[in-house]
Amino acid sequence: MGKSSILDVCNLLFSRIMQEAAQDEQITASLLGEKDVKVGEEEAKITLFLEDQGNNFHYYRKRIQGKNLHNSKELKRVSEYIRKQYLGDYLETEEEYENDDTETPQKEFTLNNENIPVYVFYGVDRYNEKTRKLRRRYTGAAGKLDAWRDSAFGGVINFRLFFEWFRGRQEYENSIRVETPNAEDPQLHAVKKAILNALGDGFSEIRVKVTEEDAELIVIKKELELAFYQLSEGEKSVIALVGDLSRRLAIANPKRENPLEGDGIVLIDEIDLHLHPKWQEKIFPALQNTFPNIQFIVSTHAPKVLESVDENIQVIRLHEDAETHLVLAEPMEPMNGWDVNTILEDYMDTEVYNRKTTELLEQINVYLNEKAYDEAEKLVNKLA
């Protein structure tokens, strides 16, 4: 089991619980498949221990002999807790019946107006820009359950949906400015703020530009107007991820003055994906600063990411035990301020130089210890 598998397990467990809590046909959970059963084993079992405000839950799912089984009683208990705590409750409809003895009042699930935490899983294939143009407008008011819909568990970012949502909020803001010139749409304002904060210095505006033929996402970078497709892959992937997450937070927090301060759990597999080393170094601090109350669980192989996290972040290294072949999780010391070479050598068991260069350096040290300076100089010249 590797780091990606751990994120997959979290997603399999959370998605089933949230699907049951929401009772929404558009929120779907994945099932354990045969590929999830280790070769040579008869079953795969995954378990979640959950604690919230003193309430403890223990839920498991497993795959055995081609069947999917789970702890249904515990699923009901934890999903009912989440439903009543954050979503709403089932209420009886108030109807008049001709015969009260034979008619049973119907119950309907009714959402409350409280904020809800978000949960999103972003996989390695999360960003796929199929088109840069918008041809279908966002329609309809979004209920807070929309924060849990639209591939929240699927690992991918619905980029087109984000564009449509952004355009819809921008058009709404423009309409209210007819009567109130300086009015702002809180949801749009929060998303813009999140994206610009994450992109950092040099970016001053983001909006949808509409012409007679199409509509495009436009950013202002160093006073230059650029279409989305003109940005680097790193900039586009940051906009896609931050835009999707901030959109969900804006929908999930109708009563919060700053939706970016909403709560939630976000899983990101290979956070350094498609990012230049400069972006690898700044992406995690940018996410932390933009979304201060989100618990991020991320995987990475990038030393630049590891050296950027502070002492408040728990770094865990996965490695296989030589005797039991079990995958062990080992807490690591904070690596903020460490140089990349040290992280590669001490934590990733990787040589800084290639094998040929390493052998030359070792031989140079041998010659120096033997005071064979002429021979050492010849090898140094080979490295020059």
Residue ranges and their predicted role:
Residues 1-161:
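P-loop NTPase switch/coupling surface
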Residues 1-26, 214-352:
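Switch/communication elements of ASCE P-loop NTPase nucleotide-binding domains
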Residues 9, 45, 121, 190-198, ...:
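Amphipathic alpha-helical segments that form well-ordered structural scaffolds
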Residues 13, 165-169, 248, 360-367:
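Solvent-exposed, amphipathic alpha-helical segments
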Residues 42-50, 73-76, 215-222, 315-317, ...:
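Short polybasic amphipathic segments
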Residues 120-123, 205-210, 218, 298, ...:
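A structural signal for short, well-ordered beta-strand segments and their strand-loop junctions
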Residues 143-261, 376:
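Extended helical coiled-coil dimerization/tether regions that scaffold
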Residues 332-384:
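Acidic, Mg2+-coordinating catalytic modules of nucleic-acid enzymes
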